[in-house]
UniProtKB/Swiss-Prot annotation:
PROSITE patterns: METHYLGLYOXAL_SYNTH, MGS. Disulfide bonds: none annotated. It comes from Rhizobium etli (strain CIAT 652). GO terms for molecular function: methylglyoxal synthase activity. This is Methylglyoxal synthase. It catalyses: dihydroxyacetone phosphate = methylglyoxal + phosphate. Keywords: Lyase. The keyword NAD does not apply.
Amino acid sequence: MAGGKCLALIAHDQKKDDMAAFARANRDLLSRWKIVATGTTGGRVLDAAPDLDVTRLKSGPLGGDQQIGALISTGEVDALIFFVDPLTPMPHDVDVKALMRLAIVYDIPMALNHATAIKLLPTLEA
């Protein structure tokens, strides 16, 4: 991912509608970013805001969370917005925890819910 700032977008299944609505409502701010997203989330974001520059990776449980983690560790992702569903058990919960750990270790801005994402996004420089 050469050039430009990169924002990662991820949403658990029960939060994908929220992420699509977030992308639609914030398309102007998001259009300043290169976006990487897990597979299904990226598809939903593109459906909601087709003009955004979104690269879809694998689905989260199939390695997409780990792909984004790798991009964080190499400095290719500058911020993470991850709409987490805390009420549904996730079979790939260890991957999710590892991803959040990497965001903390590499000290990138991270929003885990809509309210934080709304506050964070305008403060980020693309």
